[in-house]
Amino acid sequence: MIINAGLPIAGGVRFSSGSYQGTGTHGADNPCSINVGFAPKLFFVFRDDPGSDGKCDFFVTEPAGCGLWVVGRDALLAISGNSNTRLTRPCNVSGTVVGWYLSYGNAADYMLAGYQLNDSGTTYRWFALG
C-alpha cells in the first residue's frame, strides 16, 4: 500500500507498508530487500509477534524484533533494551529499494537469521515514509 498524504507542505509525505515471510538465511550473500515504491526517508521493520502477553514487547526485550533506518544512516538499527546484544546490519538504499544483511551478531549461528529479521517462516511487517 502506498499513500501520498496531501499535507500543506511542498510535495507532501509518502507512506507505504507491507509484509514478507522470512526465509531463514542471513549474511551478505543473502540480504533482505524491500521495494517501498519511492525514495524513503525512514524505514521500520518488525517481527509480527505479539509476545505471550499480546503487548508487542519487542521494543524493549528482543533485539531480533525490529530495525530502524533513517536517511543519513548506513545501518538498520536494533531497538532493544538488551545491552548484551550488539548487531551490525549494514543497510543501503538504492532508489526505492531498502536492503540490509547481518554482518555480525554475538549469538549462536542458529539465531543469526532472526537477528537479520529473516527467521524462517516468520512474518515481518514494515513501513516507510518519504
Enumerate the language-model features and the residues they cover.
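Intrinsic-disorder/low-complexity loop/linker signature
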Residues: 6, 11-12, 18, 82, ...
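Generic structural motif
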Residues: 15, 43, 91, 124-126
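Surface-exposed ligand/attachment interfaces on beta-rich extracellular proteins
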Residues: 16-38, 48-63
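Short, structured motif recognition centered on aromatic/hydrophobic residues
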Residues: 38-45, 128
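Terminal beta-strand-rich extracellular "head" domains
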Residues: 62-91
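Noncatalytic modules at the cell exterior or secretory-pathway interfaces
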Residues: 95-114
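Short, structured beta-strand segments at or near domain termini in extracellular proteins/domains
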Residues: 110-130
